């Protein structure tokens, strides 16, 4: 059954109540512009020994306009470079997309935490869902999310893709219904 929380503080309390000593994965999903990154970073600031892993670091730039949102990300690389090591209690490093060059470059340092927050529209899709301890949907009306996304991306190459991305998000939500599969729903507006 899906639980609703009102604030990030409520979400942090819920995570702490469920968190155990083993590695713990919180997955935060929502449509583009919903506020996923904001919720993820605010949550991580409230939790001891946590780190945020944005799925945008795993975008495949050449696939950003592919019809299916799932094809925009290299989810198998998330599993290989992050989740396998993390769930074994090992420190990890991964390669992120450098937007300027289109190349994969190592992140600075090594992540050695007991909780990670995966953040992105596909954060609890296969194969990632098998590793997720708590799934969170950021519920934001489509028009609000799209407006935010356009404002955020103003002046970048991404601003021109929002019409396509909005349709892709709508298709993804209709097919996969992540908001119905989430353990927790939090308002993003």
What are these regions (language model features)?
Residues 36:
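Conserved lysine of the Walker
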Residues 103, 125, 154-189:
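Small-molecule kinase domains that catalyze NTP-dependent phosphoryl transfer to phosphate-bearing small molecules
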Residues 31:
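P-loop (Walker A) phosphate-binding loop of NTP-binding proteins
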Residues 1-26:
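Extreme N-terminal, non-catalytic leader segments
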Residues 44-53:
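Post-Walker A helix-loop "phosphate-sensing" segment adjacent to the P-loop in P-loop NTPases
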Residues 51, 60-110, 115-116:
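Conserved nucleotide-sensing/catalytic segment adjacent to the nucleotide-binding pocket
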Residues 104-152:
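ATP-dependent NMP and nucleoside kinases share a basic, alpha-helical "lid"
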Residues 39:
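Hydrophobic positions on the alpha1 helix immediately C-terminal to the Walker A/P-loop
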């Amino acid at each position: 059954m899906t639980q609703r929380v009102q604030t990030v503080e409520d979400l942090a309390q819920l995570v702490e109540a469920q968190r155990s000593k083993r590695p713990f994965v919180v997955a935060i999903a929502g449509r583009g512009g919903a506020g996923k990154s904001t919720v993820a970073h605010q949550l991580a600031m409230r939790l001891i020994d946590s780190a945020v892993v944005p799925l945008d670091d795993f975008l495949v730039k050449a696939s950003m306009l592919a019809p299916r949102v799932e094809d925009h990300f290299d989810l198998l690389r998330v599993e290989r470079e992050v989740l396998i090591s993390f769930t074994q209690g090992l420190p990890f490093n991964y390669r992120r997309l450098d937007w300027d060059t289109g190349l994969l470059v190592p992140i600075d340092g090594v992540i050695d935490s007991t909780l990670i927050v995966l953040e992105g529209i596909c954060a609890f899709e296969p194969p990632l869902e098998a590793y997720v301890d708590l799934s969170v949907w950021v519920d934001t009306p489509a028009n609000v999310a799209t407006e935010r996304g356009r404002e955020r991306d103003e002046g970048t190459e991404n601003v021109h893709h929002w019409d396509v991305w909005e349709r892709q998000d709508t298709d993804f939500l209709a097919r996969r219904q992540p908001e119905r599969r989430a353990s927790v729903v939090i308002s993003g507006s």
